[in-house]
């Protein structure tokens, strides 16, 4: 598809001119004071997700110019090409069809194949979850990257829907300090091990799988080799390699499923084991609802596209190089780590689709922590630091602590949830309003003694304010709403990547380190350092000693 790069459009030039004028001087407090309808004008409702974008550094003019940029970059036709299965991952010659994994039967390419694997996987899930028959009480998922981050994020998020008596464990790091404590107290006869690797060759995953196999055989005793077939399963396309390992239960997926978009596929096996077939299908349905919103909503009300446009405005015109994710729900504590891979592995690119170096920035650094923990860690910098860092708050209206919460705890837990939500709103409000030096002077002075005069102390207690934030609201954290939220971020990433003119679906930056690691491994045994740079040679010698 022949589309202009964003910086070559008239809309880009118009945005640059706008930034040099009113856009650079934008003040949230002034904007809200001048427009009583700003909240309504800059709020959007998508499936399962409400978004308040009113506390961001944009006005109607800015948004209109950004929508013009989207149209001049042909974002709608590029979106349609992805959804139709065109090979938009051009460096690998592949389609990008994670949306097909959650589409109803017959509604997307490869539907029969997708639903064949899904039905088989969920039938297996129900067998394992019948713990009285299967005898399985623990599931150990071994994977890394997309084979780990997605399931490890979703399982705790949906804890209220999880089956009690079946405990999930995740192992990813090649460091033995990851797997050793997981296996330490498990009984092989009560454990299912999932090996999640598309090729069944991923270094870290296969190293951990071999350790798990050794542990299993040693602990199981007589008949262990034969029992591997019952106690191991694999999410892989390399059935032959899995069979050689002793695994006969395998669930495959396709080369058009990128790792960081794969939790909807057989990689989601541990999710389905945790929450069951019905809830896994609800997760898929929620994501599909967001897919349809992305595919059909006009640009003016299309939430993924609006967020992608805001990302471009912040990164390329206002110069904000970082974004903090603050989910005010402990179940979403792994979401920032998941989004780090989704966004930074997708859009951390420095060349355009033709391989030309980009003259502008792309992906911001994405980081964060669950609220309120983050307030006591890094929010100081958000409020008074020298960098402006947009914050993305995620709030859940109604708590769900699961069906097994004791009655005597319910009132206290409900009160805690109100406190949680109040903290969320207070932080977004404080970032916007700030505190003037005059206000700080009228506040009661700190009780700690100080030799500083009142004005100096007040300056230390001044907040600049005008710090931007968005707030996403879910009514409940359910399989459907979580599916929609994840899909929202996926489509937002594609939107900003398409506007930047990059391929969001390869990850060549990961490959060089893998190749060099394979070259270095034999040197740890031999000590040979010929041809290495002085730093690597010196570190090799120190680490071998």
Curated annotation (Swiss-Prot):
It holds the Pfam family PGI. It is found in: Cytoplasm. The active site is at residues 345, 376, 514. SUPFAM superfamilies: SIS domain. GO terms for biological process: gluconeogenesis; glucose 6-phosphate metabolic process; glycolytic process. GO terms for molecular function: carbohydrate derivative binding; glucose-6-phosphate isomerase activity; monosaccharide binding. Keywords: Cytoplasm, Gluconeogenesis, Glycolysis, Isomerase. InterPro entries: G6P_Isomerase (IPR001672), G6P_Isomerase_C (IPR023096), Phosphoglucose_isomerase_CS (IPR018189), SIS_dom_sf (IPR046348), SIS_PGI_1 (IPR035476), SIS_PGI_2 (IPR035482). It comes from the Bacteria. Gene3D superfamilies: 1.10.1390.10, Glucose-6-phosphate isomerase like protein, domain 1. Pathway: Carbohydrate biosynthesis; gluconeogenesis; Carbohydrate degradation; glycolysis; D-glyceraldehyde 3-phosphate and glycerone phosphate from D-glucose: step 2/4. One of its GO terms (cellular component) is cytosol. The keyword Isomerase applies. Its main location: cytoplasm. It is an enzyme of class 5 (isomerase). Its EC number is 5.3.1.9. It catalyses: alpha-D-glucose 6-phosphate = beta-D-fructose 6-phosphate. Catalyzes the reversible isomerization of glucose-6-phosphate to fructose-6-phosphate. NCBIfam families: PRK00179.1. PANTHER family: GLUCOSE-6-PHOSPHATE ISOMERASE. Belongs to the GPI family. This is Glucose-6-phosphate isomerase. It comes from Leptothrix cholodnii (strain ATCC 51168 / LMG 8142 / SP-6) (Leptothrix discophora (strain SP-6)).
